Amino acid sequence: MNLHEYQAKQLFAQYGLPTPEGYACSTPCQAEEAASKIGSGPWVVKCQVHAGGRGKAGGVKCVESKEAIHAFAEQWLGKRLVTYQTDAHGQPVRQILVEGATEIARELYLGAVIDRSSRRVVFMASTEGGVEIEQVAQKTPHLIHRVALDPLTGPQPYQGRELAFKLGLSGKQAQQFGQIFLGLATLFLQCDLTMAEINPLVITPQGDLLCLDGKLDVDSNALFRQPTLLEMEDPAQNDAREAHAAQWELNYVALEGNIGCMVNGAGLAMGTMDIVKLHGGAPANFLDVGGGATKERVTEAFKIILSDEHVRAVLVNIFGGIVRCDLIADGIIGAVAEVGVHVPVVVRLEGNNAELGTRILADSGLNIIAATSLTDAARQVVSAVEGK
């Protein structure tokens, strides 16, 4: 679950990280009042959406007057912001963040992720703040410095000092960086985060460190023990189809192709998308119905896939390990009949009762094409899309 910038900064403040004074506002009048609380300008106004690239899209602006703040709020509140990280429809802007402008002498980067190869929380720091860390990793990887947290001892002060010295900090700045490191590490662990990022972490002309922007991702599997964070969720930022899928415990990710994919198992789903692409097709989605696929879940999966107007065919790839393929076949037939599927449906069944399931599909009289293998399924669904 993603958090907005203003929510991340609220948590930063709770854990002792220095942030600019700012207020999240949902009306132009509130935005003007926030500017008055902060004091004299200039101010920075930022659209609050779950996407990067806001500045280049016009969603971040430095303004000199309250009239300009009012105009910015009127321009964006209730609208959708399109950035390079969103789809063509963009993300809805329900709030803007008003902050006092900060003078910047230097920009740094500090972030943390879960490194699955080492099974540790790994902190990364760089002198190249203010740009995407992926660009730094690609072009100048030697400028990224790392430390891993031991799960038994947790973050240690010496690790913060080590990163600070590698960034060229000393004295008061090294001490401040160490405190920010410990605070962010504690926040990461206590709030069950999967990613935390301060970019940029700036040094002001007075020599103080300030968290100018923040991004936090919470582990969705841990939300049952994070009720306060769960209340921060903004459902409006989620894709409607992905939200519908989550209600049925389906893992769905929208893509840009025209072949809908329904598979049980994440690895098989990724392999299915790969082989569709290999044979010239373009997957419209990733959809994992899980090991306990039922008629109801298959029906909802069809509804979600077909809600994408670009879908011109559907590929169902089921491996019957936990589930019986004949029951899945009955579920597919019932779902196709209930939903009213008007595009070709190619089904490949393998495993427990696969032959019986294939016969059931063949005898259904519906527009369902039974495939003999995964390769055959990919070829057939691509041919169906091409009208062959």
UniProtKB/Swiss-Prot annotation:
Its cofactor is Mg(2+). It is an enzyme of class 6 (ligase). InterPro entries: ATP-grasp (IPR011761), ATP-grasp_succ-CoA_synth-type (IPR013650), ATP_grasp_subdomain_1 (IPR013815), Succ-CoA_synthase_bsu_CS (IPR017866), SUCC_ACL_C (IPR005811), Succ_CoA_ligase-like_bsu (IPR005809), Succinyl-CoA_synth-like (IPR016102). Mg(2+) binds at residues 199, 213. GO terms for molecular function: ATP binding; magnesium ion binding; succinate-CoA ligase (ADP-forming) activity; succinate-CoA ligase (GDP-forming) activity. Pfam families: ATP-grasp_2, Ligase_CoA. Substrate binds at residues 264, 321-323. Residues 9-244 form the ATP-grasp domain. ATP binds at residues 46, 53-55, 99, 102, 107. One of its GO terms (biological process) is tricarboxylic acid cycle. Its EC number is 6.2.1.5. Pathway: Carbohydrate metabolism; tricarboxylic acid cycle; succinate from succinyl-CoA (ligase route): step 1/1. Keywords: ATP-binding, Ligase, Magnesium, Metal-binding, Nucleotide-binding, Tricarboxylic acid cycle. GO terms for cellular component: cytosol; succinate-CoA ligase complex. Binds 1 Mg(2+) ion per subunit. Transmembrane segments: none annotated. PANTHER family: SUCCINATE--COA LIGASE [GDP-FORMING] SUBUNIT BETA, MITOCHONDRIAL (PTHR11815:SF10), SUCCINYL-COA SYNTHETASE BETA CHAIN (PTHR11815). Succinyl-CoA synthetase functions in the citric acid cycle (TCA), coupling the hydrolysis of succinyl-CoA to the synthesis of either ATP or GTP and thus represents the only step of substrate-level phosphorylation in the TCA. The beta subunit provides nucleotide specificity of the enzyme and binds the substrate succinate, while the binding sites for coenzyme A and phosphate are found in the alpha subunit. NCBIfam families: PRK00696.1, sucCoAbeta. Heterotetramer of two alpha and two beta subunits. Belongs to the succinate/malate CoA ligase beta subunit family. This is Succinate--CoA ligase [ADP-forming] subunit beta. It comes from Edwardsiella ictaluri (strain 93-146). The lineage of its organism: Bacteria, Pseudomonadati, Pseudomonadota, Gammaproteobacteria, Enterobacterales.
